[in-house]
A protein has these predicted regions:
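PLP-dependent class I/II
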Residues: 1-140
Length: 140
């Protein structure tokens, strides 16, 4: 689900590209979006504040456990962290976490050369999964 707001010419170009890439959203996703849009503003605020805040806290704790530094003013559905200097690159840290803790963290190199020293955590996972990931990483 998404939304586009732009001038008419840009919208026309984007719709032309989109019409060749996909043919629409899966119907159950459309129905879920309708249901979500029908919830009250208070419900959305509560979900965003509490869910995001708790997930963000767990992601920050994971970064700290890995020795990664991060900008606490980041916003969005991901948390980026700079890896400690003793790792050669983000792949080395991601592999260590995967093999020793059985937790996948996204190595930044997959986003280009500037990501070599960074890892990315998603805040889309539920709190239980993030908490379990944190405990596994702490046990490494």
């Amino acid at each position: 689900m998404g939304m586009l707001a732009s001038n008419a010419q840009f919208v026309e170009w984007i719709l032309k590209v989109k019409s060749n890439i996909d043919s629409g959203q899966f119907k159950p996703m459309q129905m879920a979006a309708i249901a979500a849009l029908n919830n009250s503003e208070e419900w959305h605020n509560e979900m965003n504040i509490n869910l995001y805040k708790n997930r963000r806290h767990l992601a920050e704790e994971i970064m700290k456990s890995l020795g990664c530094s991060f900008d606490p003013t980041q916003v969005g559905m991901f948390l980026w962290g700079k890896i400690p200097a003793h790792y050669n690159d983000s792949a080395e840290l991601a592999d260590k976490v995967l093999y020793e803790a059985r937790v996948f963290i996204t190595p930044g190199f997959i986003f280009g050369n500037k990501g070599q020293r960074y890892v990315r955590l998603s805040l889309c996972a539920n709190e239980k999964m993030l908490d379990e990931a944190l405990e596994r990483i702490k046990a490494m």
